[in-house]
UniProtKB/Swiss-Prot annotation:
It comes from the Eukaryota. Glycans are attached at N71, N91, N128, N303, N362, N486, N501. Its EC number is 3.2.1.55. Alpha-L-arabinofuranosidase involved in the degradation of arabinoxylan, a major component of plant hemicellulose. Acts only on small linear 1,5-alpha-linked L-arabinofuranosyl oligosaccharides. Disulfide bonds: none annotated. The gene is abfA. It catalyses: Hydrolysis of terminal non-reducing alpha-L-arabinofuranoside residues in alpha-L-arabinosides. GO terms for biological process: arabinan catabolic process; arabinose metabolic process; L-arabinose metabolic process. Its main location: secreted. GO terms for molecular function: alpha-L-arabinofuranosidase activity. Keywords: Carbohydrate metabolism, Glycoprotein, Glycosidase, Hydrolase, Polysaccharide degradation, Secreted, Signal. This is Probable alpha-L-arabinofuranosidase A. SMART domains: Alpha-L-AF_C.
Length: 565
């Protein structure tokens, strides 16, 4: 039985004639549910004849321990759906094996089925957003001070077939929620649109026209029902001739956006067209599809920046499209990623590039590695230094994968990376048996910040706006560096990709005091769940006669910040 035009299925519960006491159903989450000492919000829609009490609770699956509960009085009828919501306090469970239960009186429910839809349970969310992000997971992301969010990202936009990837996704994370995420973390949104290619086939030519209309609808006419997770999506109809994303609140869809909590138009400036056509058999038709979509968007929004999903000349139009950026994805072993240090040095300075996905992969093992390790994190630092030195070309860069639930993994990349020109995040993809930037599971206190997380945080929270020429008595390797400044400080970033100690003297004009932050560890060392040993250490440092003397241990990464204002 559909709950709405957008939610076409629901749970039907029939009670056996011999049932007694409390009956109902449970949701066991993703390998359990994290239960902490905090307030939980829960909601569900109900339809069917039932007047009485519903018991909502969080319990141990094996132990039966009740950590929190609420009795809720309901009066449901068979003629309509009714939403019920409540909150309750919970005590902490120290195990992952927990479940949410909804129970009702068997005697009262006998003889007619009860229907339930859009069942939800939320802990406190980041900035208290409705349908928002988990606080414990969102905060480490916010601590990175990321600059943009590419969404829905990767194979979630490319899909196994039109509209769907092949493993479970948090589909309640919709267009509004992505944009609130951007607003709450002060990130620039990079909106991906489907370009007609999925792993189940390609739609091109005249057959692409309905999807061109859909892109226009998303931007200026009708928000696609599948992209809006707010309950009001049930009332949206096609061909509403007003604007949701970009329209003023005086229009019907602008008014809807305002009712959803955002009176001002969403600040859409960047749109990427598809995902990885060069890697997955799309090149024969991508040039034509790209032109079709480019022309459709550019005609109405000439000031938007449009991004092709690859840099392959054989996968792009023969005649370059004005103002088009290019996206480049690559994963490498640690040594190969370091070898790409100067990859962008001789690139066309007129080009503009988004490195939408990259990371260090240990390809000596066909399955990659399970955990971020210090050599790989140092390799990423070297590569980030190379990207920052070329930030006139590489405008944005994002590592992938960002995070994962340890029990729900799909592919292996040893560690994530990020650009220092603009640090971005790629939320959709996941690694195999490894924490990527960081990982978690349903057991409390399982959040595991990797060595790469700390390297990325060191770099992303110490960004400059100007890259400076450095006069050096040595060449790059095994020590790599870049010097930048902003309106208040100089930043010097260093990485020692080698097994020997290195000492470097750094002269910074005019100031004699700074702060040095450093992370280092054995080549193969990793942070593991419950065993986080490798973290950055900060200390004050004074300049001597030779400047700031920095001793770089093997596989060490450091950032020197010298404030002049």
């Amino acid at each position: 039985m559909p709950l709405s035009a957008a939610i076409k299925s629901s749970l039907s519960v029939s009670v056996r004639a011999d049932a007694k006491g409390l009956v109902g159903f449970a949701n066991t989450g993703y390998n359990g549910i994290t239960v902490l000492k905090q307030t939980y919000w829960t909601s569900f829609y109900m339809k069917g004849e039932y007047s009485g009490t519903v018991l909502l609770r969080l319990t141990g699956t094996d132990s039966g321990t009740v950590y929190g509960s609420r009795n809720l009085s309901v009066k449901s009828t068979g003629g309509k759906w009714t939403q019920y919501e409540t909150t309750f306090e919970a005590n902490e469970s120290y195990v992952a094996e927990n479940e949410w239960q909804l129970l009702f009186d068997a005697a009262t429910a006998k003889g007619h089925p009860l229907h339930f839809g859009l069942v939800q349970l939320f802990p406190p969310t980041y900035k208290n957003r409705t349908n928002g992000l988990r606080n414990d997971i969102a905060r480490p992301i916010a601590d990175l001070k990321p600059k943009f969010l590419r969404f829905p990202g990767g194979n979630n936009i490319q899909a196994d077939r039109p509209g769907d990837w092949h493993y479970p996704n948090t589909d309640a994370l919709g267009l509004d929620e992505y944009l609130w995420w951007c607003e709450d973390m002060d990130m620039v949104p990079v909106l991906s649109v489907w370009d007609g290619k999925s792993y189940g086939g390609i739609v091109s030519g005249e057959e692409l026209q309905p999807y061109l209309d859909d892109i226009k609808d998303e931007l200026e006419v009708t928000l696609p029902l599948t992209l809006l997770s707010h309950p009001l999506r049930a009332y949206l109809t096609p061909n509403t001739n007003e604007q949701y994303l970009l329209g003023p609140p005086s229009t019907p869809f602008g008014a809807l956006r305002a009712r959803n909590g955002h009176p001002d138009p969403w600040p859409i400036q960047y749109i990427e067209i598809g995902n990885e056509d060069d890697y997955s058999g799309g090149c024969d038709t991508y040039p034509d599809r790209l032109v079709q979509i480019y022309d459709t968007i550019h005609a109405s929004y000439p000031n938007l920046t449009l991004i092709a999903n690859n840099m392959d000349e054989n996968c792009l139009p023969e005649i370059p499209l004005p103002g088009l950026w290019h996206d480049y994805h690559y994963y490498r072993s640690a040594d190969d990623l370091v070898a790409m240090f100067n990859y962008w040095d001789n690139h066309d300075r007129g080009d503009r590039v988004l490195v939408g996905e990259y990371g260090c992969r240990n390809d000596s093992n066909p399955d990659g590695v399970f955990w971020s390790f210090m050599q790989g994190s140092c390799a990423e630092a070297v590569h980030m230094i190379g990207l920052e030195r070329n930030s006139d070309v590489v405008m944005m860069a994002a590592y992938a994968p960002l995070l994962q639930h340890f029990g729900y993994t799909q592919w292996s990349v040893c560690t994530p990376s990020a650009s220092l020109a603009y640090l971005g995040i790629h939320p959709a993809d996941r690694g195999e048996e490894q924490p990527t930037l960081f990982g978690f599971e349903s057991r409390p206190n399982s959040l595991t910040l990797s060595t790469s997380y700390y390297v990325n945080r060191m770099f992303s929270t110490n960004q400059g706006s100007t890259v400076h020429k450095v006069h050096s008595t040595a060449g790059f390797g095994p020590l790599y560096w870049v010097a930048t400044s902003n309106e208040t400080a100089y930043q010097v970033k260093l990485a020692n990709y080698g097994a020997a100690n290195q000492t470097v003297n750094i002269r910074v004009p005019g100031v004699g005091r700074g702060v040095l932050e450093m992370i280092s560890g054995p080549k193969d060392a990793s942070n593991l769940p419950g065993d986080i040993k490798i973290v950055p250490v900060s200390r004050n440092i004074r300049a001597g006669k030779e400047g700031y003397t920095v001793h770089m241990p093997p596989w060490g990464v450091a950032v020197l910040v010298v404030v002049f204002k």
